Curated annotation (Swiss-Prot):
CDD domains, sorted: ACT_RelA-SpoT, NT_Rel-Spo_like, TGS_RSH
Record pathway: Purine metabolism; ppGpp biosynthesis; ppGpp from GTP: step 1/2
UniProt name for this protein: GTP pyrophosphokinase
Residue ranges annotated for the TGS domain, each copy included: 404-465
Any one GO molecular-function label of the UniProt entry: kinase activity
Length: 743
């Protein structure tokens, strides 16, 4: 068990800043800056003796914050900012004085940490929507100019919790602890900083649920020595096996955190005795392949529980966490959780995003393994030093990490997540399609803004609507800048398509009537053939499809000609022969179904056939056959455009075909996904296919940067049309996907 620690500088009279700095083994310039800052803070407090009853506590807070951040290997600027933060929070100095003495960078960092207090305005503890709270946390990360502000604030909250009993009244303490539980602990988890996350969680649990906390702590303490001896023996045995096969490996017992134990008990509905990971061991290796070597050794030497295995190396958690988790049975059949990770994975899990700002001066230890990983960050920071008063570098850094998102508020304070560059119309359509259709204006912070205004982080938008929907076609033009997201434009297009139906029906009817007049056909003759072909309910649907261009008129006419017009006597004779052959097809068909189980061609057994590549039909599709020159019969979808052209030219070569009952071969088909261009789109698509056990045979993609659209074509292997419909439906539900269809 790891017990949370209280404030440890209990004898401030004995505290000597110079000795303390020496103990941290800091670079000379960093040490000097911290000493100057400490004396600066002390002198300010001494200047207000009546108001500063908690002066000692404030100085102590600054020192503890520095210690926490130093353990995270934070840089000198971060440490100096932490030392000064208590006097800034208590308004003992002004910004000009700070800027003059400590510089613009430190002043900007201090302002950023203070901005973190705005989280209280969000009142996240009253939100019942988990997604809403998560958006608030993500917005908090993106709002600040420098990630170090977030980490400093987390350190400040930990120092508060360590001494909360002496800092404020009970009611204020409970509110502050809830704030840490709802906002700051999940924030530390999102940043991947395990060292801060577990301490925040355990403190919050101790204050909010003291009885449960004490009960678990007591259970852990009762058999602590026996458990420690058991783990020590297991570690010794396991280390021997591992060192025979892995050059560099470290094995040790892993400390348990009370909150994580309680959470697992609640989640899995277990008693304390039923937990697997009260006894836990961690294996640290240097190379990725050694993780799986170690896993093989562990599973070979000890019986493992398959249901308790998780590979977060191959499938990292959303915050980047990587490790292999497994549970094995040690001596006496006692379960032991084993975690396996590389040193870099371990450092990432403990330091998370703080690793990007690690303090390097005078440090040549194991942290040098991070050099390759953060080289690009160093270049950005060096570039920042060369540019005066420029926020472009940090903006680029934020976009790399947070996928170019902007988080804005509704009038009720709800957070809406949109791509950077979104406009008020994008916001309106994100709320609801009808809000977008009826939008006639927008206010940001009470001020009217144009539709081309690009939303900024933290904007509060009020949409002005009219009674009836009336979107403009100009909104669809990306060059005009009214809309930015593909989803907004798709909703606008859908509205116009629906509204245009009244215009398309008479236009389509006129086009079809003109063509039928040339063929001496009536609409009554055409209706029984045309409606089933396109799966339509009535003639208005047919006219609307022709008028909008969704139904190609020339294809329809070719189809109708093949069904209703016999051009020559020779063709008529051939048609009669085909009908005669069809009369004897039933017995032959039954035989084919039993013996072939594939495609059954009317009246012919065991005839060579192949699937046409132009339309790639699969079981469930309506199909027809076409007699080729020397290659047997090619099987097409009944609505295949290429087949319709062939049929119009040589109708005598067409033979009716159906699927056999036992056709089990895999079919190759092409699908297309059109979506708003975003990071992780291809990963999400392939995940859906993998979950359905669909093989991907080929992928090609292209992007339209102006329209922010991505088009992905894929060749996949399927067995029937039902599974295709299921796949397309799941793909269509993915975020930002506009269309998923078969080609």
């Amino acid at each position: 068990m790891v017990a949370v620690r209280g404030s440890h500088l209990l004898n401030p009279q004995d505290f000597v800043i110079e000795q303390w700095c020496t103990g941290l083994k800091l670079a000379e310039q960093t040490e000097k800056s911290l000493i100057d800052a400490w004396y600066y803070a002390r002198d300010l407090m001494n200047a207000y003796p009546d108001e500063m009853k908690n002066a000692t506590l404030m100085l102590q807070s600054g020192v503890e914050m520095v210690e926490i951040l130093h353990e995270l290997n934070m840089d000198a600027e971060t440490l100096l900012t932490a030392m000064l933060f208590p006097i800034v929070a208590n308004k003992l100095t002004d910004w000009e004085s700070l800027k003059e003495k400590f510089g613009a960078k430190i002043t900007k960092l201090l302002k950023g940490v203070l901005e973190m207090d705005n989280i209280r305005q969000l009142n996240a503890s009253h939100s019942a929507n988990a997604l809403q709270v998560d958006n608030v946390r993500r917005m908090l990360l993106a709002m600040v100019d420098d990630f170090r502000c977030v980490i400093i604030k987390l350190a400040e909250r930990i120092t508060f919790l360590r001494d909360a009993e002496h800092r404020c009244a009970e009611e204020d303490k409970v509110l502050a602890v809830k704030e840490c539980s709802y906002i700051y602990a999940p924030l530390a988890n999102r940043l991947g900083i395990g060292q801060l996350k577990w301490e925040l969680e355990d403190y919050c649990f101790r204050y909010l649920h003291p009885e449960q906390y004490r009960a678990i702590a007591k259970l852990l303490q009762e058999r602590r020595l026996d458990r420690e001896h058991y783990i020590a023996d297991f570690v010794s045995e396991l280390s021997g096996y591992l060192r025979e096969n892995i050059e560099q490996v470290e094995v040790y017992g892993r400390p348990k955190h009370i909150y994580s134990i309680w959470r697992k008990m609640q989640k899995k509905h277990l008693e304390f005795s039923g937990l697997y990971d009260v006894r836990a061991v961690r294996i640290i290796v240097q190379k990725l392949q050694d993780c799986y070597t170690a896993l093989g050794i562990v599973h070979t030497q000890f019986k493992h529980l398959p249901k308790e295995f998780d590979d977060y190396v191959a499938n990292p958690k959303p915050n980047g966490y990587q490790s292999i988790h497994t549970v094995v049975l040690g001596k006496g059949g006692k379960p032991i959780e084993v975690q396996i990770r590389t040193q870099q994975m371990h450092d990432d899990a403990e330091l998370g995003m703080a690793a990007h700002w690690k303090y390097k001066e005078g440090n040549t230890g194991s942290m040098s393994a991070y050099e390759e990983k953060i080289a690009w960050l160093r270049k950005l920071l060096a570039w920042q030093d060369d540019i005066t008063d420029s926020g472009e570098v940090l903006a680029e850094l934020r976009s790399q990490v947070f996928d170019d998102r902007v988080y804005v508020f509704t009038p009720k304070g709800e957070v809406v997540d949109l791509p950077t560059g979104s406009t008020p119309l994008d916001f309106a359509y994100a709320i609801h399609s009808e809000i977008g259709h009826r939008c006639i204006g927008a206010k940001v912070a009470g001020r009217i803004v144009p539709f081309t205004y690009q939303l900024q982080m933290g904007d509060q938008i009020d949409i002005i609507t009219q009674k009836n929907p009336n979107p403009s076609r100009d909104w669809l033009n990306p060059n005009l800048g009214f809309t930015h997201t593909a989803k907004s434009r798709a909703k606008i297009q859908a509205w116009f398509k629906k509204q245009d139906r009244d215009k398309n029906i008479p236009a389509g009817k006129e086009l079809l009537d003109n063509e039928l007049a040339l063929l001496n056909l009536s609409i009554k003759q055409v209706e029984p053939y045309a409606l089933p072909r396109y799966n339509l309910k009535n003639l208005d649907d047919l006219y609307a499809g022709i008028g909008s261009g969704d139904i190609r008129l020339n294809n329809l006419i070719h189809f109708l000609q093949s069904k209703l017009i016999k051009v020559t006597a020779e063709e008529a004779d051939q048609e009669i022969l085909r009908h005669v052959a069809n009369k004897s097809a039933v017995n032959s068909q039954q035989k084919s179904e039993k013996n072939n189980g594939c495609v059954i061609v009317e009246g012919v057994d065991n005839l060579m056939h192949h699937i046409a590549r132009c339309c790639q039909p699969i079981p469930g599709d309506a199909i027809v056959g076409y007699i080729t020159m020397g290659r047997g019969i090619s099987i097409h979808r009944a609505d295949c455009e290429q087949f319709l052209d062939l049929q119009a030219a040589h109708p005598e070569r067409v033979v009716e075909s159906i699927w056999g009952e036992n056709y089990a071969s895999g079919f190759h088909i092409n699908i297309r996904i059109v979506a708003g261009d975003r990071n992780g789109l291809l990963r999400d698509i392939t995940t859906v296919l993998a979950n359905e056990k669909i093989s991907v045979l080929g992928v090609s993609s292209r992007a339209d940067t102006k329209k922010q659209l991505a088009t992905i074509d894929m060749e996949i292997e399927l067995h029937n049309v039902e599974s295709l419909s299921k796949i397309l439906a799941r793909l269509a539900k993915l975020d930002d996907v506009i269309e998923a269809k078969r080609l």
